[in-house]
């Protein structure tokens, strides 16, 4: 009989270090934040083609890497994906490839990050990030009180300003987030 933990966490990540979260798999990731430090991970308990997650952490270097990967499991133990929650008291660099995912970036401190794949992204008002690179097919919801600059080809609401530097959602305010769209991507922005 095989037994794998469907939930694990590390709440002891130091706020003295930045962390690089690396995920690369053909499954769904639901990413959210929580008040505190560290991370939690659990399975999306529905049929799928994804193995249970495990995390490998480096203890040296800057940023310190946390790599999520699939455990090799029987096809009977495959799940729909993973729910991952990140502590809002750590600084994260995201490098994620996933499919049909929901990425909630509402209350996180991020260094420049990359998201690849497909799904929905929510940029929350408490997001702290300089730049985000998107590659793939995404629908991105932007709250009215977050000023962003979108560089590259993307579908944006009609009321956004198409300036020489890119598309601005709040042209009366200084943008605080730069989102770069990689060529060949299909990204739709909407106000939320």
Q: Model features per residue range: what roles?
A:
Residues 2-40:
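Membrane-interface segments at or immediately adjacent to transmembrane helices
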Residues 8, 12, 35-36, 43-44, ...:
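Short, surface-exposed interaction patches in beta-rich subdomains
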Residues 16, 61, 77-80:
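Solvent-exposed, conformationally flexible loop/turn segments
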Residues 17-19, 25-27, 37-39, 64, ...:
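Envelope-exposed proteins and targeting segments
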Residues 20-23, 27-29, 96, 129-132, ...:
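Short, well-ordered beta-strand segments enriched in hydrophobic/aromatic residues
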Residues 28-30, 101, 186-188:
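Short loop/beta submotifs within extracellular cysteine-rich repeat domains
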Residues 31-34, 75-91, 189-192:
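Extended Gly/Ser/Thr-rich low-complexity repeat segments
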Residues 91-100, 105-112:
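Hydrophobic, well-structured mid-protein blocks that either form specific transmembrane helices
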